[in-house]
Amino acid sequence: MKAFGFLKIAIIFMVSGSSTATIQKTAHPALPTPAQLQKMSSRFSPTPMRVETANLTVADRQALAKLVEAARFFDEIFLKQLWSGNLELYLTLQKDRSELGKARLRYFWINKGPWSDIDDYKAFLPGVPPRKPVGSNFYPEDMTKQEFERWVATLSPAEQESAKGFFTVIRWADKKAGTLAITPYSEEYRDQLSKVAALLREAADLTENASLKRFLITRADAFLSNDYYESDLAWMDLDAPLDITIGPYETYNDELFGYKAAFEAYIGLRDDAETAKLSAFTQHLQEIEDNLPIDSGNRNPKLGAAAPIRVVDQIISAGDGAHGVQTAAYNLPNDERVVNQKGSKRVMLKNVQEAKFRNVLVPIAMRTLSRNAMVDVNFSSFFTHILAHELMHGLGPHQITVDGRETTPRAELKELFSAIEEAKADVTGLFALQYMMDHASAMKLGTVLPSDDAAQRQMYTTFLASAFRSLRFGLNDAHGKGMAIQFNYLVDRGAFVEHGDGTFSIDMTKIKAAVQDLVHDLLTLEAEGNYSGAKEMLDKMGVIRPVLKRAFDRLQGIPTDIEPIFVTAEELVPTVSSKPSATPKPSRKKSVRKK
C-alpha cells in the first residue's frame, strides 16, 4: 500500500556486464507532448519529507547514513526487475536535455519505467512495449503461462518450489525445447546486493542496538545466500529507534502468477508514543478472528504471536516502495513459515499518511461527499483504518486444504490473490473496527478508539472518501481493483448512496450488514482456494461502472497521490549523481515535520 524525483537520487548504475534487452520498436498511438507529460506528472503532489533525527545517538545517526546509501541501490535493482530494457532506457533518457526529454525523464522516474502505473501501465515513451510485460522481468517476456506450467510439471517437488519461489528469476534454457532455467536473486543481482550487504554490515558495526545489529547482519547474509528465513525472524524481533525494512517482499509486479518478490526499502524513525497507543489493538486479534463472519472451521484457533505494530516517519523509500502510488503502510513478511511462527508486523508510515490525507483525500471529499457527510472526514479515522487494514492481512485463512492438498490462498488464487486479499483487508478492517467499537468498554479501548455513533459515522464516511482515492490508482493496481469490488458491492447493497447532485453519503442502516456479508464472501473465497469464484467476482465487481466515472469527472485537477522528496535523506547523504528529476526542488516551506 507504495514517486519520486525532484531531489537527487544516488544511483551508481553498473553499465558494464548488465543484462539488457534490445528495446522493442513498437508502434504507439500519439505519445504525450511535454505539456501532457507535465499534466501527467502533476497528478503526484511534490511533498518534502522531513524527519527530525536529533534524538538519535551519534552511532545510530552514522548507521542511518549507511542505510540511506544502501537503500538507494534498490532503485537500480527494481529498474532491472521491472523490464529488461529499463536500465538502458533510463541511461538514454538522461542524455536528452530537450524540454521533451526532461519531461520524459521526470515521469519515467515517478514510475520507475516507461509505463504509467495509474493509466493501466500504458506506455508514454517510444520504442517500448505498449504495456508493461505481465511478468515484468521475472520471466522471459515471450514466455506464456502455459509454457511455464508445462515446464514446471516436469520438475521435482524441490525444483517446483524453487521455480515458484519468491526469490528466483526464470530464463529460457532452450526455447525450442520449451525448457527454462532458475536463477536465484543472489546471482541475478549480485553486483548490487554485494554492495548493499557491505553497507548493512557497516551499519551493524556502528549501531549499539542489539536487535538492529542482528537484523542487519542476517539480512546482509541473506542477500548473498538467497535464504531470507532467519533474517525475516530477526526483522520480526527488531526493536530499535531506526525502523528498517529492506529486501524482496511484495509480488504485485508479477501479474503472471504473483510468485516473484520485488526489492524495496523503507528507512524510517519510530514514533514511540503513537506505536504504544496503537499496539493496544493487537491484544484483541484472536477475539476478532474467533468472530469473523465465516464458517468456524475456517477460522484460525491460534494465531501467531501478537502482531507488533510500528508507527514510523519515513526518511526514504526505494525500489518497489518508490514508484507510482506511495505505500502508506505494510504488513510483512509474506513467508507463511514466519507468519505461522511469529505472526507478521504492521508498519504505519505516519508522515506519508498525513501527506496523502492533506493533499489528496480532503480535496476529494470536498467534491464527492454531500455537505453533511463532509464534516465526518478526519485523519484519525483514515489512520486507524489503514492500521486495521494491515492487521487484517494477518487474520483469516493462511493455510488451507484443497482436494486433500495442504496449500495457501496465495498459491490457489495465483494472480487474482493480491486484489482479493487487498479487498479482504480493507473491508475486514471495517468489520474489526466495528467489532472493537461495539466492545470498546470490555476491551478497554476507550482511550484509543472512540466508539459513539459519531465515531462510527466518521469511520465509514472517511472510508467512502478514501475509496475514491484508491480507485484512482487504476484497476491494474491490486488496491484499486480490490476497492472496485468493495465500492460496487456496497453501492449494490444501498450502503453507499449517490445523490442527485452527484455526491455520496453512507446509509448507516445498511452499511454494517453489507460489510459483514462482503467479509464473508471474500474470506470464503480464500478459505476454499476458489480461483473460479475469485475470477467471477473480479470480472463482475472489479470494474469501473458509470457511477464511478461520473464521480471521477468531478476530481479533475486533484492529485492522485504524493511525490515524496526525501529532504532529510539528502541532507544526511548528499547524492553524487545527476538527479533523475528535471524539475527544481519545491520550497521547503511545504516540508512535513513529524517528531
Please identify what each model-predicted range represents.
Residues 488-595:
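C-terminal, non-catalytic "cap/extension" segments appended to globular domains
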Residues 185-374, 378:
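Contiguous, non-catalytic segments that form substrate-binding/exosite surfaces or channel walls
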Residues 209, 418-436:
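An active-site-proximal "capping" alpha-helix that borders the catalytic cofactor pocket
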Residues 14-32:
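Bacterial Sec-dependent signal peptides at the C-terminal "C-region" and cleavage site
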Residues 430-536:
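Long, well-structured alpha-helical subdomains associated
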Residues 381-398, 425, 430:
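Active-site recognition of the HExxH zinc-binding catalytic motif
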Residues 397-423:
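Post-HEXXH active-site segment of zinc metalloproteases
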Residues 27-207, 211-215:
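N-terminal helix-rich structural modules
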